[in-house]
Structures are given as C-alpha cells and as structure tokens.
Amino acid sequence: MEKDISRKIDLLNILIEEKRWFTLFELEKNLNCSSKTIRKDISIINDLLPKTIFIHSKKGKGVKLSLPQNQSISEAISNLLKKSLTFLAIQQLLEERSNTVTSLADKLYLPISSTNIVLKRVSKYIKKFGLSLEKKPLRIVGDEFQIILMFSERYLESYPDTEWPFTEYKEEMLIDYINYIEEKLEIVFYSNDKRRMAFIMTILFKRIKQGHKVKFSEWIIKETMESIYYKKIFEGKNVIKVNKNRSLNIEEQVLLVIMVKLSRYVSKDENNLKQEELVLYKEGESTTYTYVKNFISILEQELKIDLNNNEEFVYGMIEYCREAFHILKFIPILKAPEKDTCKYIKKHYEETFYLVKRAYNKWGAEMKLTDIPDEEIAKVTMRIVAIGKQHNINRKKVLLITGEGKSWEEYMKSRINKRYGDQLKFVGGHAKILNGNTDNIDNIDIDFIITTVPLNFSWKSIVYVSPILQERDFYEIGIFASK
C-alpha cells in the first residue's frame, strides 16, 4: 500500500481511539510527518467521509473526530483502499486485462518505472498467500484456491459494505445461491461471512470462465464428499451454476463446502444444538468429541485449571475444534497474513499463550497436525483468558456481532463485562438479524447491538466499535449501559 494512503488510514485509527482533542505535535510524532501534511490529509479524508462524520481542526485545540455512535469510519477507509495503486493493479490482474507490464502501466496511467514499484508491492502482498508474480506474461501463479482467497480478501477490504464491485454477475443471483445453502443446512451466516461467500463464489466463477481450474487431493475430495455439508448442498439437483449451461464440477463444489465450513454461522435452533452436542461430548462415544476432550485435558494439565466442567468453554471448544481441525488437517496450504488481534493476544497474554501453545503442539502431535500457526493458538488463548473475566450478574441484553471469529468475540465479551459486568448480559446470535430480516427488530428481546462490522440496516441502538476495544468504544458502550 502507498505510504500516503497508509498514513491517512493510520490517522483515522488514531483519532477513533479516544473521544478527545489530539494535538498536532502528538499526531506528527505518531505519523512521522509534518503538520502541513496532516492538515492536507484531513482535508482529503473529510471529502471521503459521510456528511455526519467530520474531522475538526482548531488552532489551540488540535484535531478531533466527530463520530456518531451508530456509525463507523469503514466507508472512508474502504474509499482510501480503492484508490491504492496496489489494489488497482490486483484488480487488473483479476480481470486479466493486462498481460504485460507496459499494458498495465497504460491502464494505471503510470510510467514503467512506477508500475514496477507497484508490482513489487503486489508481489509482497500475495507472497503471504504462498503466491508469486510472473511478468511474461503478467499473472499471479500458485494454488488456485489460494488465488481465489487472496482476491476475495483484497476485494473485501476495499468493498466491506453494500457496494457490489462485479458488474458481470448480479449480486442477487449470488445471494440466492447462499440463501439456498442456508436453507439446506438450516443455518444463517454472519453478514460479513455471507458477503465473503458471495465474493468467493463470484471470483470462482470468473476464474472458471477464464479457464483456470481448482485442484484438491483425492483425500480432501473424499473426506468433503462424505460430509453432511456436501450431501445436503449438492446431492440431488444442481442449483448452483456458473451459468445456465455450466454446473460446478466436483472440485469446485468441494471448494464451496470448505468455505462454508470455514465461515461463521448460527444454527436456526442453536440452544437445542448446544445441548445435543454437550450430551454427545459427555457420552464420549464419538471420536469427534473424544478429540475435543483430549485437547481440553491437555490444556488442563498445562494451565493447572479446571476447564472440563465449564459448559460454555466446552461447547466453544467443540465449535472451535470442528473448524480448526478442518483448517489444519484438510487445508495446510492456508497462509493468510497474521491479524492484529493475534499480535495483541501474544503481547498481552504472553505466559498463557506459551502454555496453550505447548498444549496445542502436544495435541497436534497426537492428531498428526503439523505447523500449527500462532493464529490458532491465539484463538484458544482468548477462550482461556475469557473464562476468568466473565460475570453472570448482568442486566441490559446485548447482541455482539464481530468479523474476527468466535474466539475473539468471546474475548471482547469478557473485556466489556470486566468494565460493565453488572450492567450487561450478552445474548446469542439472532438468525433474523444476521439474515438482514429486521422488519420486527423492535420486538426482539435485546436492548442494543455492539458490532465491529457494518450492518445492512439502521436501528436506534447500534454501537460501532473497533475489534481491539479503545476508550472511545467503552465510552459509547457505557452510554447505552447506563440508560
């Protein structure tokens, strides 16, 4: 990403941390630039912000972000990312409109020398996904599944909300396909996971049309086709098609099933499902639950705490292991960049992280899992940390919606409860809200929603917060908690 765009995003992230005036000296020091550059950045950012959000700059006071509690800065950040030459180059590579450096330079209105600098940034970005860039012809090479993941993640960063970037495929058609998957599996995807599925599907269709092929090992294909997910979605009539004359082949179907398993969703009958799974776990007859029980036992030995009698923790680990085992066993090629949330946990809970890592590696050896990434260790660490911070005497009913995964969601709950534990009670995900069906939202038994992702509806009681909670976020939550 270009330095000027990165700096503007950093400026926004600094201003959103706290609801106060920041001095120009503070900002100069944090951003390593002059006050003149900061004022210029503020002017550009204000043009990108919605009318209700504004960055004030006053002599003698400094700089302050005016942000209503029911809005976020995601629109401004996505607008900045769309202007990034790195993204524009990746966009051209997806469309396969430029097969030489010269033709790409013409598309970007840049000299050859500047285009080569942009391509170096592209190479650095895609390397995190195990991919590389070839110049003759100009193209991205590597595992096709990773290529699709890379394109979808980059597009989601630039189009996180409601704007649809793919003109040749109607969004309504993709959403219909995803609704069909939800209906067959009796689930509701989280809103940002539903959007990710739509992007994955569209990019898959585009790549198929361009002649690219998805490949998996025979073992992955066999395991996936035997799963209940595959049988419910694809056995029977072929509903999901690239076009009216082209159905998905087996490996393309497998890719979509894998993405469903890696997505976050809620069951339409979540409470009954939870109780059924806990009963099966306690009976210990299924190997699936035996694996989870062994993991929890190893964690207890390393951490010297009781975990097996905590039903919330056990059920959370059942959910987690189902996804993690699939990632580590079936898709060892995933090489996504480390998230800020992972870095945060490693820094602030170093000892717990180390003990969980030791336990995870022991369990991994038993399960023949190799190269367990820190991202997965951090997810389990978050669940351990959350146990000691949760309280049950709460009042206001709150729904928390995040885009960072279930483990981080539990950790966020624990941090909010630590501050407002005697005032709030977190409730389970409501399928209607996640599905965007909000006609009767006022009749749902919640007092307000806390979310880290943009929602596709308006409501009087929504608090937008950062994934790593800041003082500004606690202040906004406190307003609703005190009402």
Curated annotation (Swiss-Prot):
InterPro entries associated with the record: BglG_antiterminators, HTH_Mga_DNA-bd_dom, Mga_HTH, PRD, PRD_sf, WH-like_DNA-bd_sf
Keywords: Activator, Capsule biogenesis/degradation, Plasmid, Repeat, Transcription, Transcription regulation, Virulence
GO biological process annotation, one example: regulation of DNA-templated transcription
Swiss-Prot/TrEMBL induction comment: Transcriptionally regulated by AtxA. Transcription is also positively controlled by carbonic acid and CO(2).
Note from the entry: AcpA has a larger effect on cap gene expression than does AcpB.
UniProt family annotation: Belongs to the AtxA/AcpA family.
Name of the featured protein: Capsule synthesis positive regulator AcpA
Organism for this UniProt entry: Bacillus anthracis
